[in-house]
Amino acid sequence: MTAKLNSVIINPSVAHTATVIFLHGLGDSGQGWSFMANTWSNFKHIKWIFPNAPSIPVTVNNGMKMPAWYDIYSFADMKREDENGILRSAGQLHELIDAELALGIPSDRILIGGFSQGCMVSLYAGLTYPKRLAGIMGHSGFLPLASKFPSALSRVAKEIPILLTYMTEDPIVPSVLSSASAKYLINNLQLKCLDRPFEGDAHSLSSESFMAMYKFTQTVIGSP
């Protein structure tokens, strides 16, 4: 059992029939993404969970502690990965999913996702979770620990819709990594992944990517 995550939770205003679990990026918090629930208030049946990453030493932050799902050794070489940290955080996300199942929410009514680091953890966790999820959505990320696939892929992963959005000139997570991951998911792993690049040079969520995520949420769990 891994350490339990502290989360910002926004409960539905009607009967709870679906859940979204969304992970923030490096140095952020669950509160920083809770605006999604307020902006998408028409999804009255959805419970929103925005977990807070633990504060850990981060190499690119001169070893100082900050909220992070795993260590980042270098922004210049993002393929050098903190495997233990990624696996630990993916396990914590699995436990959050398990907790929703225990409340009676079917796995195919649980949508997971995230931004940057949160996107990467969500991709790994979703593709390795043993039950079929409603979907996986992420912005400004790529598939971590890619060498573990396809062997790490769950037997139901090919049934899970995936949305990967990113900015074409992202200064932190190069779009070439996001694009390559999307192509790998589609062509090599034969997964149902939507590859959605948007013009822009910021490491942030654009209005276009936000709308794409809204439409994706509407498609996979929008109906009560």
From Swiss-Prot:
Source organism, top-level taxon: Eukaryota
Enzyme class name: hydrolase
GO biological-process terms attached to the record: fatty acid metabolic process
InterPro entries (UniProt xref): AB_hydrolase_fold, LYPA1-2/EST-like, PLipase/COase/thioEstase
GO terms for cellular component: cytoplasm; cytosol; nucleus
Lineage: Eukaryota, Fungi, Dikarya, Ascomycota, Taphrinomycotina
Coiled coil stretches, renumbered: none
MF terms in GO: carboxylic ester hydrolase activity; palmitoyl-(protein) hydrolase activity
Protein name: Acyl-protein thioesterase 1
Role summary: Hydrolyzes fatty acids from S-acylated cysteine residues in proteins with a strong preference for palmitoylated G-alpha proteins over other acyl substrates. Mediates the deacylation of G-alpha proteins such as GPA1 in vivo, but has weak or no activity toward palmitoylated Ras proteins. Has weak lysophospholipase activity in vitro; however such activity may not exist in vivo.
Localization per record: Cytoplasm; Nucleus
Chemical reaction(s) catalysed: S-hexadecanoyl-L-cysteinyl-[protein] + H2O = L-cysteinyl-[protein] + hexadecanoate + H(+)
Entry keywords, A to Z: Cytoplasm, Fatty acid metabolism, Hydrolase, Lipid metabolism, Nucleus, Serine esterase
E.C. number(s) listed in UniProt: 3.1.2.-, 3.1.2.22
SUPFAM superfamilies hit by this protein: alpha/beta-Hydrolases
Family: Belongs to the AB hydrolase superfamily. AB hydrolase 2 family.
Active site: residue positions: 116, 170, 203
